[in-house]
């Protein structure tokens, strides 16, 4: 189910080649070329993350897909292996952490590494950038910001914060509201939902380190807080959400209304990607998408008439910049008059 939803949504992201021809028959083509190889980091043996990272690579027709996935008690996760086969993965290496990033970059020698991870994994990807490419974002520990008011279902707020915090100790969960009366109710609800949770200790430690409730004075302050936090996941669980959405510019993904919990996007129910910008990088980057698996090359063909008619403009600019060699190169192609 998740595979099909992710495949369908990401297939819609395909771009087209561009071709431009001017009146002198000079031609520029801008072609989309799949990367030759991609390395995918799968944290905590999560098949959902493998699907999010490998399905777009499959659609883009990347030739070689290498997955780094650590073992659990000495064994490979069958769900991850099934997802790998479904997505056409070429090879699986059994290691995790920063060392997996090193393996993908220097031993597997892939063109690009994608996939979220811990602070160590994030730093490792920054260190190997230049030798290989990485996503155009910081894909670190998970984050959620829930925007709620006095009419929002308290249990929906609490369960969303708990579900985000169970990812790990470094996960961040924030509630933003201007209604003081709901704060105590949310705190009690979180404790209630933790009673029988298997990862209770992780959630408690995560909330202690990175849990936050921000009480705002007005709507203007709410917008400022959200855009400054630039959260990975934003839940806008309000009846009057439209007045906020047009002013929110910084978020990895936005879940709108009471029936769209962040957890649904983590498992591909809608079909959008869950590898999203963290640590404020949503201010300048987007979530993982099909374009991450392509590069684009310009193919330029000038005609004799074209360079004769237009070459003088290059000469003017190159002479102005003091790059006479450029001017000579242009003149050598032009018809002498």
Residue ranges of each PLM-predicted region?
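Conserved NAD(P)+-binding/catalytic subdomain of aldehyde/semialdehyde dehydrogenases
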Residues: 88-172
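A conserved active-site cap/scaffold subdomain adjacent to cofactor or substrate pockets
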Residues: 137-209, 213
